[in-house]
Amino acid sequence: GPLSPLLANIYLNEYDWEMARRGVPVIRYADDIVVLAKSKRAAERLLETTRRYLEGKLKLKMNVGKSKVVSVFAIRNFKFLGFALGKGKNGIYIRAHTKSLKKAKAKLKELTSRSQGRNVRVVMQKVKVYIRGWLGYFGIASMKTTMREWDKWLRRRYRSYIWKQWKKPKTRAKSLMQLGIPEWQARAVSNCRKAYWHMAKNGHVQRAISKERLARAGYYSILDRYESVHLCD
């Protein structure tokens, strides 16, 4: 629960001071700890020192399965607090870990589910709240290309959502015509029986439910938000 990180900080404060006294750089959030060392031998020694201190002095059980020595230069990346940290051709990088991205996209998919039957503006507001919170944490990560792809994906999700809500061919044709699609094209598209997701990519549907119209309806661009909070590149 919310109290657990606070209790961990209080209880492990003694460990922080001990490592600081020894001149050992430590990054810690609650009970997730990264201990930095200059060599593999030093890292292995510090891992054992940490285990003895936590288990002997503080009477805590260290998860041996999750505790290991890694080099940010020798491996592709390592995961910490939902981030993937490593070194690439352009130097050290911080990215959202694959698992974090997968979890976030699953949540967005859930929030934009066509089965909920809510007004699309209500759905957009819920998505906006989630995006702001998620990027408030992960906005430091380098992932502009991913955010651009998600932006397109979300707009398509909304188009398929709206297309389903229009339900009947007559309603779809009328709505398309009101949004500027010629009658003969609107009627042809409205009678198409292809899946909602497929129809969301139809040129006439995209023109009717354009990026600008979605924005006026309350669409919150995940790419724009990312660019406004990401200050590291």
What residue ranges belong to the model's regions?
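Non-catalytic terminal/accessory segments
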Residues: 1-233
